[in-house]
Amino acid sequence: MPMLKDPSQKYRPFAPIALRDRTWPDRVIDKAPLWLSTDLRDGNQSLIEPMDAAKKMRFFKTLVQVGLKEIEVGFPSASQTDFDFVRELIEGGHIPDDVTIQVLTQARDDLIERTFESLKGAKKAIVHYYNACAPSFRRIVFDQDKEGVKRIAVAAGRTIKRLAAAAPETRWGFEYSPEVFSSTESDFAVEVCNAVVEVFQPTPANRLILNLPATIECATPNHYADQIEWFCRHVDRRDSVIVSLHTHNDRGTGVAASELGLMAGADRVEGCLFGNGERTGNVDLVTLALNLYTQGVDPGLDFSDIDAVRKVVEECNQLPVHPRHPYVGDLVHTAFSGSHQDAIRKGFAQQDPEGVWEVPYLPIDPADIGRSYEAVIRVNSQSGKGGIAYLLEQEYGISLPRRMQIEFSQVVQKETDRLGLEMSAAQIHALLEAEYLRAETPYALKGHRLQEENGTCALDVEVFDKGESRHWRGIGKGPLEALVACLPVRVEIMDYHEHAIGAGSHARAAAYIELRLDGQRSLHGLGIDENLTTASIRALFSALNRALGQQASIRAA
C-alpha cells in the first residue's frame, strides 16, 4: 500500500499545550540530572536474545564503573531469570553501598508481592510501578475509564507502601510512571500523579519519583518540554517529588526531548547506554552525558574509556553501535573532506593543550574519551592536501611544504580514484616513497664527497646514468650550488626546506627542494638521511629526476 497523498485522513497531529508563559526556552542546563540506567530492564526486554545471568552481571559492573548510582536491574515478577539475578545481586554482595537498584512491576497485587520477595535483604531499593493512562490505551487495551485508571494506581501504591513498611531493614524508594504520559491529557496525568502523591506522602527528605514517559514519541521535543513544565507547575508537593524523564526515540529526537525536558524543570533521566531499548530505543545516556560535558558541565558519569564500555554493551546486547553514533561511532571523529581536514590540521597546530578546546569539526577532544587521533583524518577521493599532510606529519614526522602538499595531493587523488578506496597512512607513505624517495631515473646517486675551503665547496658526485657510472664535479658557495653547477642540464632551485625527523642520536634529516627545469613548471623532490647534506643532495636528485621524467612525457605526447 503506497503512502497517502493526504496523510491527514489517517494521522492526527498532536494538540499543542496552551502555555503562553512557558519559561523553559530561557533556561540552560548547568548541572547534571540524576541518572538511571534501564539497560538491564527496558534495554534487555527489547533484545532478540535477552541477556543471560553472566552478561547481566558483566553489564551491571560496567554501569557501576561508569558511575551510575541508580540502576534498574529487571522485572522480577515477570521473569524467573530477572528474579534470580536480583537475588544474586543482593545475596552475592555485588551492589556497592552508594548504588541503589530499581525493579519494575505492573500495578497488580500478586506481581507487587513477588517483586518484594525478590528484594528481600536489599540495603536500598526503588520499587517502580506503572499503569497506562493515555486515551487509546484506556479504550483499546484496558477498557477502563479515567476513574478506573486512577483507582489502579492508588490501590497499587497502597500495596507497595504496606509491603515496604513490613520490611524496614531496607531503605525504600518509590517510583510511579503514568505510562504513555506523552499521549495522556496533561490535566489527567497530573490528577493521577497527585492521587499517588497522596498515597505515599513524600517529604523533601524522602522524595517520590514521578516518571513521565514518552513511551511512544509522538510530537516534537518542544511539546514534551511544555508537558513537563505544565506538570511541574501543577503537581502537588513539588519540593517532595523527583520529576523523571523517560524518552524514546520513535521520531529520532529522544535526546533533544530529554534536554528540553530538563530545561522545563525535570530532575532525573532514565535511559540506556547508546540508546538501546524498545523499537527505536530509549534515550542514549552517553550522548546526553557527553553533550553536557562538551558544554563544560560535569555529567557525573565517566566515559574516559568509551570503547571499553562500547565493547561490553555490544557483546551483551549482541547489537552493533552505528559507525555514525554520536561520540562513540567509528567514524564520528573522522574527516574525509579536504576542507574539513585542512581546518582540523590547522586547529591541532594552534590548540593550546591547557586552553579551551577549539579544534574545528571536533566538538570533543577524542583523547578525553580514550580515543586516539589516528582516525581523525582519513584519506579517500574526497580528501585534500590538509589531511594527507596531517597523516604524514603525525605518523611519520614528515612536514611537507605547502606547495609540495598541493603537488603530492594530486598524486594521492589519482591513486584513490584508481583504487576507489580509502588510503591508510601507511599506503600514503608508501606512495610518497615511490614518487619521491625512489625517483632514481635517469640519475641514481651512488655517493658524494664534499670539500670546503675558504667559503667554497667542491662537490664530487658519483651517479649511475642509465646503468653507466659517471663522475661529476662542481664548485659553489654551498653543496647545492656546487651540485647545480655540475649537472648536465640547467636547473633553478625555487625553494628549499629542511627539518629533523625525531630527536637524539636516531634523528634523521628531511630536505625538500622545489626545482624548475628549462622553464617548465616547478616540481618537488624529497631526501631523507641521517646527514643533512646528503638529504639535501638526495632531494635535488629526486626533484631533477621527476622533472626530467615530466619533460620526457611532454615530448612523447
UniProtKB/Swiss-Prot annotation:
Q: In which pathway does it act?
A: Amino-acid biosynthesis; L-leucine biosynthesis; L-leucine from 3-methyl-2-oxobutanoate: step 1/4
Q: By its UniProt entry, which Pfam families does this protein fall under? A: HMGL-like, IPMS_D2, LeuA_dimer
By its UniProt entry, which PROSITE patterns does this protein fall under? AIPM_HOMOCIT_SYNTH_1 (PS00815), AIPM_HOMOCIT_SYNTH_2 (PS00816), PYR_CT (PS50991)
Q: SUPFAM superfamilies under this entry?
A: 2-isopropylmalate synthase LeuA, allosteric (dimerisation) domain (SSF110921), Aldolase (SSF51569), post-HMGL domain-like (SSF89000)
Provide a GO CC annotation, any one: cytoplasm
Q: Which reaction does it catalyse?
A: 3-methyl-2-oxobutanoate + acetyl-CoA + H2O = (2S)-2-isopropylmalate + CoA + H(+)
In short, the EC number is 2.3.3.13
Q: Which UniProt keywords apply?
A: Amino-acid biosynthesis, Branched-chain amino acid biosynthesis, Cytoplasm, Leucine biosynthesis, Magnesium, Metal-binding, Transferase
Q: Where is this region: Regulatory domain?
A: 439-557
Per the record, the major location class is: cytoplasm
Subcellular location(s): the record lists: Cytoplasm
Gene Ontology molecular-function annotations: 2-isopropylmalate synthase activity; acetyl-CoA C-acetyltransferase activity; magnesium ion binding
Q: What does the function comment of this entry state?
A: Catalyzes the condensation of the acetyl group of acetyl-CoA with 3-methyl-2-oxobutanoate (2-ketoisovalerate) to form 3-carboxy-3-hydroxy-4-methylpentanoate (2-isopropylmalate).
| PANTHER family per the UniProt record, alphabetical | 2-ISOPROPYLMALATE SYNTHASE, PTHR46911
Q: Which family, according to UniProt?
A: Belongs to the alpha-IPM synthase/homocitrate synthase family. LeuA type 2 subfamily.
Q: What is this protein called?
A: 2-isopropylmalate synthase
